[in-house]
Amino acid sequence: GFAVNPSDPDEFNVYNDPSWRPLLQLAEERSDLIRMRSAVRSRSWDPYRTLSSEAESDELRDLVQFHRYVEDEWHCTRVTVRAGGRTLTSTTRRNAQVDTVWTTEHLLKSVEDLDAYLQLPAAFFAEQIDVTPLVEEDVRTGDRGIVMVDTEDPLCAAASLFDMGDFLTVAMTEPTRFHRLLEKL
């Protein structure tokens, strides 16, 4: 499936715990492998992925800020996006014991937030397609399995921007705005 790196010393990498090693080794050696890899960002809406690319620009850096911190047993990330005269914020957190990122505050909370988000420049949404990771993983996997192209669709990307109730409300009551969002993503 997804990329697992048990040698990564990050305290929030659940797979570096020694208890995982026998299971990971067994799965690697005794099962057909399905390696999920993408030729684009795994989450097209993620501003961190945009700014981490070689195509980053001062314009984009001025629009997006990240604050990473540890609170109790949680690794938290607060993202602030300045768009359309508004300040949009989201917060995620991840526990060191579970490989799940929980969104505790979604970026878009209203139709007005969506309107502001739609004013972001095209570079914010730009994708750099690179099939190299797929080819490299295919060579490593060999005849032990397959490489599955893992790319999200615009509908899932849009859903992740909102609380589910807000997402459904906007999708049903604001079809023109929602379609514009899907076109951007």
Regions found by a protein language model. Name each.
Residues 1-185:
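Catalytic cores of TIM-barrel enzymes
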